[in-house]
């Protein structure tokens, strides 16, 4: 699969970052991986992270108004995000929007989250440093264990060793344990190939994904 952003999601991210960047926000999540040239799986949301206290509150209305001015429909989402299942406390400093135009919809999340390295600037705007993106992705694989998490981490194994990935995950979430890592790999073994096919992986790509984790402890 080629690594290219979805044009609609890329536009939403670019417009939001143009005003949220002043409050420390940078592109995170699957969109950030694509911006760094890693992976190309379909994504359902746009994640923007800041390490600035009060940044979410300061940017939320600005982002909302700017997207409206750009011709999007924007609604605030009240229910808790699944990100709170990955990192404790996300619901206490975050805002989520549903952004629509014509028949396209994407969820936009503004989140307060610590980072270890300064973001870089790419064509979309500020993007989390790859180490920070990967750290959150591996932590998500361990705690959330969704098929997309394994896809993202397997793609990162082309640039990072297993040891490096574990270290970055522990930097993002120091509470992770060896047992949780092992449980995550056991869950991978139980997942049927059909769940990965939903992300447009071919049978050969699914085999490669499983092989990428073959030497991880279970």
Regions found by a protein language model. Give the residues of each.
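Compositionally biased terminal segments of proteins
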Residues: 1-218
């Amino acid at each position: 699969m080629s690594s290219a952003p979805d044009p609609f999601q890329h536009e939403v991210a670019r417009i939001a970052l143009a005003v949220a960047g002043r409050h420390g926000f940078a592109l995170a999540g699957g969109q950030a991986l694509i911006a760094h040239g890693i992976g190309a799986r379909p994504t359902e949301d746009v994640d923007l992270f800041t390490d600035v206290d009060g940044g979410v509150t300061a940017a939320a209305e600005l982002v909302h108004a700017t997207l409206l001015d750009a011709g999007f429909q924007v609604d605030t989402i009240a229910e808790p995000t699944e990100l709170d299942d990955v990192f404790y406390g996300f619901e206490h400093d975050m805002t989520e929007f549903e952004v629509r135009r014509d028949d396209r919809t994407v969820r936009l999340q503004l989140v307060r989250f610590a980072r270890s390295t300064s973001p870089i600037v790419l064509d979309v705007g500020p993007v989390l440093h790859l180490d920070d993106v990967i750290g959150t992705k591996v932590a998500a694989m361990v705690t959330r264990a969704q098929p997309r998490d394994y896809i993202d981490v397997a793609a990162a194994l082309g640039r990072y060793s297993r040891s490096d990935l574990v270290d970055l995950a522990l930097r993002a979430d120091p509470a992770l344990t060896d047992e949780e890592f092992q449980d995550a790999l056991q869950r991978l073994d139980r997942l049927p190939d059909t769940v990965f096919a939903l992300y447009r992986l071919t049978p050969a790509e699914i085999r490669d994904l499983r092989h990428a984790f073959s030497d991880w402890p279970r």
